[in-house]
Swiss-Prot record:
GO molecular-function terms, A-Z: exo-alpha-sialidase activity
Entry EC number(s): 3.2.1.18
Gene: nanB
Superkingdom as given in the UniProt entry: Bacteria
Organism: Streptococcus pneumoniae serotype 4 (strain ATCC BAA-334 / TIGR4)
Protein name (Swiss-Prot/TrEMBL): Sialidase B
Disulfide bonds: none
């Protein structure tokens, strides 16, 4: 297995206006370990307790501050932060100069940022990124490692947190932080503005060093970290994606832990966009992970490491012409030993919002479903893909000279046809999608194809015979709701393999129902079982656990602010009415929930573990909730609530699995993926390892 390190680099910025300030005390310099840096700091010290009173380091720092480039390296903890607080400040404290200061600040939402202000020079910069910090892990305050680089040569201000570049902003008018007019105060835990402390902080600064130099990316990478997390998928890895969403985890019978995810190239936007499905695996209980590969991908658009704009003008830009995959789910078939992965498939330019809801994309002929195609220049779908991939003309009732191969590529007379690939960039303030000169095989899902599928959503299946080391070509599943209804939407996460039979089940949803896809022959054929739900427009993403033989409990997202559940007592054939869990809150739009049945007893009872945000005000406050199962009636007592991080820190889609050593692996979106302010964040899908004792304290 190709093992790799987890230091990563990313770049995202938010430009704004103003905000901050603070005050003074004393310090002692320690010998601190900051990796293989090429120069010595002009100041270093620690540790400092911040309790709503600033610490003045002016006499120790200001006379040494010189030159036009600086670096600040800081290790700090803040598990009970104020809503807005300054960690470090340089300022002109005299009357009339309240807007002359530099500040490194944080918010209690996990945002980190800087302000650089000089009223006389007309400089007013604010750069920040939300969802950048950790507050606590396993009940203890987390030490965050912050590096801020002010580089006069490149005219950039760059922030790294916990080994991740969270923003790098280039400006036309660069102001060195050392050249702010009239600096006379250097403070920890506040900024001194006109003699008053502003943005007081709570927490601790364990170590801090300042350098009269802009240190390099390579030097930053040598600074030791105390991260509680890993990155399985990261910006710039083998996927060449800058963004990832919708994680899954699944522990195979061999002990290998498999993960899949959306590798997103057009920011964090859902389809329509360019999105592939990537996978990685671990053979050592999640300690190290293989280099990602693709389980499903299209080639109509190039895999590009693009930094999507986060400003209000451009952040809503979406790739409009690419085909995509989205929302994967995994199950292992114990009979054949193969791994099955399903995902939604979207043709070029199609997403949930604009998919044709009244067309399956298939035509039924003599009890068989055939994929429909429209030829360029036609007004309707006059062709179908028949046996052996032959493209059949429905008007003449004759085969054509065209065929579709197992990759859904178009051939004429046995010869592959091609289209020109697209690349994207931002030019003159707008998104540009342009041909790049590379020819790729023509595919019926591509916008430039001679033949195109119906612009609706589909479900695809791929399998792996070697536990995720490689994947076969995907195949479309047939429609389950008839010709005149679009496909159901896959519930991302895990499928369910029943213990005492060969049955496999995946949960999907459509308007007003959960539609369970069931296979009893290792995924060769599928049937459906429908269960009505009292929501017409809910994204009812569901996950299943088998409480005991043939008894399945499904937990799912709703529009009620609660997690719903239903039960089947006949291996998924029929389902109970919907009930709701008390004691766990979600927003009115809901969030995906992840669930597993734990293999060991907890407090002498069988147990279920849920992963969910527990908040009415956003996708935040992530918890693992342990429920103890009462055998008499299959009711569940939700006894233990474990906080992933602070209640105000983001937690959106998640995946959990029981590792071979009985720990719990958690891969989750550590940000509020619903918030328009938190679009297009890189390296926020993070993996942690928890022991069951952590959850039940």
């Amino acid at each position: 297995m190709n093992k790799r390190g987890l230091y990563s680099k990313l770049g995202i910025s938010v430009v704004g206006i103003s905000l901050l300030m603070g005050v003074p005390t004393l310090i002692h310099a320690n010998e601190l370990n900051y990796g293989q840096l090429s120069i010595s700091p002009i100041f270093q010290g620690g540790s400092y307790q911040l309790n709503n009173k600033s610490i003045d380091i002016s006499s120790l720092l200001l006379d040494k501050l010189s030159g036009e480039s600086q670096t600040v390296v800081m290790k700090f903890k803040a598990d009970k932060p104020n809503s807005l607080q300054a960690l470090f400040g340089l300022s002109n404290s005299k009357a009339g100069f309240k807007n002359n200061y530099f500040s490194i600040f944080m918010r209690d939402s996990g945002e980190i940022g800087v302000e650089i202000r000089d009223a006389q020079k007309g400089i007013n910069y604010l750069f920040s990124r939300p969802a950048s910090l950790w507050g606590k892990h396993k009940g203890q305050a987390v030490e965050n490692t912050l590096v801020f680089v002010s580089d006069s040569k490149d005219k950039t201000y760059t922030m790294y947190v916990n080994g991740i570049e969270v923003f790098s902003e280039t400006v036309d008018t660069f102001l060195p932080i050392s050249n702010i007019n009239g600096i006379d105060k250097a403070t920890l835990g506040a900024v001194n503005r006109e003699g008053k402390e502003h943005y007081l902080a709570k927490g601790s600064i364990d170590e801090i060093s300042l350098f009269n130099k802009a240190i390099s990316d390579q030097e930053v990478s040598t600074i030791p970290l105390s991260n509680p997390f890993q990155l399985i998928f990261q910006s710039g890895d083998s996927t060449q994606a800058n963004y990832f969403r919708i994680p899954t985890l699944y522990t195979l019978s061999s002990g290998r832990v498999l993960s899949s995810i959306d590798a997103r190239y057009g920011g964090t936007h859902d389809s329509k966009s360019k999105i592939n499905i990537a996978t990685s695996y671990s053979d050592d209980n999640g300690k190290t992970w293989s280099e990602p590969i693709f389980a499903m991908k299209f080639n109509d658009y190039e895999e590009q490491l693009v930094y999507w704009p986060r400003d209000n003008k451009l952040k809503n830009s979406q790739i409009s012409g690419s085909a995509s995959f989205i929302d994967s789910s995994i199950v292992e078939d114990k009979k054949s030993g193969k791994t099955i992965l399903l995902a939604d498939v979207m043709p070029a330019g199609i997403g949930n919002n604009n998919a044709n809801k009244a067309d399956s994309g298939f035509k039924e002929i003599n009890g068989h479903y055939y994929l429909k195609l429209k030829k360029n220049g036609d007004n309707d779908f006059r062709y179908t893909v028949r046996e052996n991939g032959v493209v059949y003309n429905e008007t003449t009732n004759k085969p054509t000279n065209y065929t579709i191969n197992d990759k859904y590529e178009v051939l004429e007379g046995g010869k592959s046809l091609t289209v020109e690939q697209y690349s994207v960039d931002f030019d003159s303030g707008s998104l540009r999608e342009r041909h790049n000169g590379k020819q790729v095989p023509m595919n019926v899902f591509y916008k430039d194809s001679l033949f195109k599928v119906t612009p609706t959503n589909y479900i695809a299946m791929t399998t792996s015979q070697n536990r995720g080391e490689s994947w076969e070509q995907f195949k479309l599943l047939p429609p389950f709701l008839g010709e005149k209804h679009n496909g159901t939407y896959l519930c991302p996460g895990q499928g369910l393999a029943l213990k005492s039979s060969n049955r496999l089940i995946f949960a999907t949803y459509t308007s007003g129902e959960l539609t369970y896809l069931i296979s009893d022959d290792s995924g060769q054929t599928w049937k459906k079982s429908s269960a009505s739900i009292p929501f017409k427009n809910a994204t009812a993403e569901a996950q299943m656990v088998e409480l005991r033989d043939g008894v399945i409990r499904t937990f799912f997202r709703t529009t009620t602010g609660k997690i719903a559940y239903m039960t089947s007592r006949d291996s998924g054939e029929t389902w109970s009415k919907v009930s709701y869990i008390d004691g766990i809150q979600q927003t009115s739009y809901g969030t995906q929930v992840s669930a597993i049945k734990y293999s060991q007893l907890i407090d002498g009872k069988e147990a279920v573990i849920l992963s969910t945000p527990n908040s009415r005000s956003g996708r935040k406050g992530g918890q693992l909730v342990v429920g103890l199962v009462n055998k008499e009636d299959d009711s569940i007592d939700w006894k233990y609530h474990y906080d992933i991080d602070l209640p105000s820190y983001g937690y959106a889609y998640s995946a959990i699995t029981e590792l071979p050593n009985h720990h719990i692996g958690v891969l989750f979106e550590k940000y509020d993926s619903w918030s328009r302010n938190e679009l297009h964040l890189s390296n926020v899908v993070q993996y942690i390892d928890l022991e069951i004792n952590d959850l039940t304290k």
